[in-house]
Amino acid sequence: MELVACVDARPEALEAACDAGVITARQCYPSIGDAIEDQKTDAVLVTTDGAQHGDVVRAALRARKHVLVEKPFVESMAEARELVDQAAALNRTLMVSQNYRFFPAVRAAQRIVKGQELGQLLHVDIDFRRFAHVSHRLHWRHPLLLDMGIHHFDLMRAVLGREPRTVDCRACNPPWCGYSDPPEAAAIVDFGDGVTVSYRGSWLHPERPTAWAGEWLMEFEQGTVTWTSRGDRSGLRSAEGDAVSVYRHGTVPDRIALPHLELFDRAGALDAFTRALAAGTTPESTAGENLGSLALALGAIRSAECREPVQLMTSANSR
């Protein structure tokens, strides 16, 4: 993999990339059209603001490039389906970088659920707490439920191996906090067959912050599992802070060994993308697969706005 061009409408951003030694001035462009026309490229990495994702992804696909796009994919289901269909029609890979999947604690939790190592899963509690009263986040669209919550909603689907059926959410925006949209929320997500997830998230907690993936407690027939992932010191080759503990009924807690991963986080997502392109296979978290996570995030927002449960379409029938 080689970085051949950098696109940004802001000259100061391109200058900063050059100063950092990431790229040369000859490889900097003000628009994706200019870059694609001038450079030989196989794929495009889209890291713009979420509201701009659709236009940039559309332009890259139109030029027959594979695309890896930052989460959240886009801000509406209609646009998401349009881009998924466009990628399929052009036989291009379109993947969403749900980078929280690429951590060892997540893989261990997936294995425990899939292998029914403690019997059937019954219920999950997830808590996310951070204090992020910073100016650039105050005016983001739904800084918790969409921008941050998309990570947690995607992990629910990835770890449980199920699709959500309904979501009932309430959000809070205290008048003193300065956010345009609610920075706190609580939700109950029904995954069918008696499996529910209780989710609580907040950007207003200065004390006892959780890791970025949150604190998970999973209740099974034969015990419970607690885990957390993506601590503050996590990096491209580090998963410091990842931990999984298993509590079988009648036994002492056991902090289990975690699976080995070569790369983590965004590097893990990028590696999965490039490996899939090289092998001609389908990567994890394609845009089509990601429809379920986006539908859950947007459904939680709708539920919070109308203060009623919202029925969700699964990824199997959302097309």
Segments the model singles out, each with a brief description of its role:
Residues 69-70, 94-96, 125, 199, ...:
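Hydrophobic residues in well-ordered beta-strands that form the structural core
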Residues 153-234, 267-279, 317-319:
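Contiguous beta-strand/loop segments that form the cofactor/metal-binding neighborhood of enzyme cores
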Residues 25-32:
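Conserved SAM-binding strand-loop segment of SAM-dependent methyltransferases
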